[in-house]
């Protein structure tokens, strides 16, 4: 089973990752509390899963990009941002191998 199939099976079987990492929340609060225009800062996440961390970053006003193996994970992330009127924060989301896709950034 390749990585793409593995992660597709994981994300298509149940709901995953609704809440962001506590470490990310602390990091953003500590380092970006006083930044007035966060939309000029692009956050790139490798292995975004269903996008809980990028959702938080978009909600905080950052532009977001990511790479993920699972098409289902990406679809759930995009749907969540669309449902919450945050999809305008998405710069680029790619599906596939990190090593290959990272060169495209």
Placement of each model-derived feature along the sequence:
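Conserved SAM-binding strand-loop segment of SAM-dependent methyltransferases
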Residues: 85-98
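Conserved SAM-binding loop
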Residues: 77-78
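A short acidic, Gly/Pro-enriched loop at the edge of an enzyme's catalytic core
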Residues: 100-105
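Conserved class I S-adenosyl-L-methionine
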Residues: 1-49
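Conserved SAM-binding loop of SAM-dependent methyltransferases across substrates and taxa
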Residues: 50-60
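Conserved SAM-binding motif I beta-strand of class I
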Residues: 63-68
């Amino acid at each position: 089973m390749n990585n793409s199939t593995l992660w597709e099976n994981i994300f298509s079987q149940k709901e995953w990752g609704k809440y962001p990492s506590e470490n990310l929340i602390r990091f953003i609060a500590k380092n970006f509390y006083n930044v007035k225009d966060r939309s000029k800062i692009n956050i790139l996440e490798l292995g975004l899963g269903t996008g809980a961390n990028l959702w938080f970053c978009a909600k905080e006003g950052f532009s977001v990009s990511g790479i993920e193996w699972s098409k289902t994970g990406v679809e759930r992330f995009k749907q969540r941002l669309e449902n919450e009127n945050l999809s305008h924060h998405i710069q680029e989301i790619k599906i596939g191998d990190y090593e290959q896709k990272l060169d495209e950034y």
